[in-house]
A protein has these predicted regions:
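Extended, low-polarity transmembrane helix blocks
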Residues: 1-133, 140-221
Length: 221
C-alpha cells in the first residue's frame, strides 16, 4: 500500500519535473492507440515504483524455490529428483489407459525421450540455477523482461507436465512483468543496464537512419 501511494504521489508531480512525458502513441495507418493508463504503466518511468511489489513477490518465490533445489539433493548432483518428477508425470496409473489428467500426450512423449536419454543429469542443474537467476534478476531489477520470460517458460513447462501448485499464478504475474519490461526494472539495475545495452530494433532503426542519411544525395545535385 505504501509503495502504491508513493507511486501515485510521484506521478502527481510529473508537471514539476520539467521532463517532457509523451503519453500519446504515434498513430499511423493501421495503428491502434493504447489507453493512457496502459501506456503510463508500461512505458513511463515515473510509475516504475508500482512494479516493485510484483517484482519482489515473484522474485522471492523463484529465489526460494531455486535455493531449495541447489541446496537440496537430486537436482544439481545428478538430477535424480528431476528424473523422479518426469517418471511420475509419464507413468500411467494402474487400471488406467492414459496418463493423469492435466498432461498432454505430445509433452508426455517429450518427457519420456528426455528421461530415456538421461537429460535429467544436466537439466536438473539448469532448472535449479535458472530459478535462482530468475529470482535474483527480478529482485534486483536486472533484465526483468528476460528473467520474467524464462520464469513463465518454466511455469508453462511445469504446467504441461501436470504440476499445478503456484505455476498458474506465477505464470500470469510473469506475463505482466514481461509486458512491462521497459520500466519494471527502472527501480533497479535496469535503470543503467537497459540504456547501456539498448534494444535490437533500436540498433536496426539507428543503422537504417544512418544508412539513409549517407545514401541520400545532397539537395540540388
Amino acid at each position: 500500500v505504501i509503495i502504491a501511494v508513493a507511486g501515485f504521489m510521484q506521478a502527481q508531480r510529473l508537471p514539476e519535473t520539467a521532463e517532457p512525458i509523451n503519453v500519446s502513441a504515434t498513430t499511423g495507418d493501421g495503428q491502434i492507440d493504447d489507453p493512457r493508463f496502459w501506456k503510463l504503466m508500461l512505458g513511463n518511468v515515473h510509475y516504475a515504483i508500482l512494479w516493485l511489489p510484483l517484482r519482489f513477490f515473484v522474485g522471492r518465490d523463484w529465489l526460494s524455490a531455486g535455493e531449495h533445489k541447489v541446496r537440496g539433493d537430486g537436482w544439481v548432483d545428478g538430477g535424480q529428483a528431476l528424473a523422479g518428477y518426469w517418471t511420475n508425470a509419464t507413468t500411467i496409473p494402474e487400471g488406467r489407459s492414459a496418463a493423469p489428467a492435466g498432461t498432454f500426450g505430445w509433452y508426455e512423449d517429450f518427457l519420456r525421450y528426455m528421461l530415456n536419454h538421461e537429460w535429467y543429469t544436466w537439466f536438473g542443474k539448469l532448472i535449479a540455477w535458472g530459478e535462482v537467476l530468475v529470482g535474483i534478476g527480478l529482485l534486483v531489477g536486472a533484465l526483468v523482461g528476460i528473467a520474467a520470460f524464462f520464469g513463465t517458460l518454466m511455469n508453462f513447462s511445469f504446467g504441461l507436465a501436470g504440476s499445478a501448485s503456484t505455476n498458474p499464478v506465477l505464470f500470469g504475474l510473469g506475463v505482466f512483468l514481461v509486458l512491462g519490461w521497459k520500466v519494471a526494472g527502472w527501480m533497479g539495475v535496469d535503470r543503467v543496464l537497459l540504456p547501456m545495452l539498448g534494444t535490437p530494433w533500436g540498433r536496426i532503426e539507428k543503422y537504417e537512419e544512418t544508412h539513409h542519411t549517407h545514401s541520400t544525395p545532397p539537395a540540388g545535385t
